[in-house]
Amino acid sequence: MTSQLKRTLTKRYGVLELWEIIVIALFAAFIVILVLSVWLSFRKKSKRSNATTLPVTQSPRFTEEIKEISVDHGSSNNNGTSYQTLDEKFVEDIENGDKFSGSLEKKPLVGSHLPPSTPSTTAPSPLLGLPEVSHIGWGHWFTLRDLQLATNHFSKESIIGDGGYGVVYHGTLTNKTPVAVKKLLNNPGQADKDFRVEVEAIGHVRHKNLVRLLGYCVEGTHRMLVYEYMNNGNLEQWLHGDMIHKGHLTWEARIKVLVGTAKALAYLHEAIEPKVVHRDIKSSNILMDDNFDAKLSDFGLAKLLGADSNYVSTRVMGTFGYVAPEYANSGLLNEKSDVYSYGVVLLEAITGRYPVDYARPKEEVHMVEWLKLMVQQKQFEEVVDKELEIKPTTSELKRALLTALRCVDPDADKRPKMSQVARMLESDEYPVMPREERRRRRNQNAETHRESTDTNKDNDITTDAKI
């Protein structure tokens, strides 16, 4: 048996014996299997890497939660014709040269709390010196341990804000960079949704008047966002006394903050695709740096919309007093909703009042309605914040009031774009509406008044006849 096997294996096939051919074949098969194994392993790793990497150029998508409808430019949501009449009356007063009282005349600028602007320089990256951790297209991927160390294990002393979304902590990274860590609530599904909304809204955008999103943490059930830290408070704190230890905002500082906010919104609405509707514009969401440059923050309610589209919501989100009437009434949302909210903030900065304050007399509870009544009665000096040591000039106040009134127009289609708002506030001209539009409204109001007068006369005649 052994000798027969030996003869078989030593049998020659050409120049090689059979056993040599078998050894060569086995070796070749081993090499092929090894090469295939290495190739498959490399390919698997490559796929896994691609699955966790979001290209920077990829447009954020949120279509599964956005219902788009075409815009009907012919429609309007005019539920307050008296407001339009009031705005028109104010414009006519300006054109006729009506003056404010002498108490608003310009005075020397003293005691300003607005520090001199520092020359703009290229700031070093706040992530400089941090260890390289996995990146997902943008920003920095922080570990839970990183943020625990930064916030002293999320101590109560580190809390700088909270709300229905979660808690915001002040922290310091290992490279000494101060940050604001937004820790979303661990509600099943909701934290992931809020996280995705905010990342898609601001993760890829860059503007000097938008608070910068530095990175994030996704670990277990934890969802956290890491923002640059603004140590100069927000507009609400400055307007309503929480920053009284630093003084009061001057008129110039207020306008500077509002112009910066307008430019940030113009960028979100007009410069990127899909456009971003913030949906929660209010004074507490406008942060400030040491030079009083505005930094718009909190994109937890933001919506991404395509061109010429609205969002229809079954649940109205936002802050009472700032929400646009058409959105509150019908759930119809677009960028003009932000314009209305911005107008409320501008009036808040002018008056120093909250949009809704039930501690005030009944006719003064709603700031927008009260202000329009005051303008109608030509009590312009009464609307200016009493805390302003140096009042704005006549032209400055007119410009700001007219801009705000256009922003809070009850007809959303007649509100200006935010780029126009920024130009209005920076311009030396009054932001009046086109003459043809004013003439049309004037004729419409006159016709309405004439019809009302005729109706009253008919009623009087009927009453006399009965007597």
Curated annotation (Swiss-Prot):
Top EC class, one word: transferase
Leader sequence residues: 1-35
Region (Disordered): 102-126, 413-467
Glycosylation sites noted in the Swiss-Prot or TrEMBL record: N50, N79
Disulfide bond annotation, renumbered to this chain: none
Residue ranges, Cytoplasmic side: 145-467
CDD domains linked to this entry: STKc_IRAK (cd14066)
EC number(s) from the headed UniProt entry: 2.7.11.1
Protein name: Probable receptor-like protein kinase At3g17420
Upper taxonomic lineage: Eukaryota, Viridiplantae, Streptophyta, Embryophyta, Tracheophyta
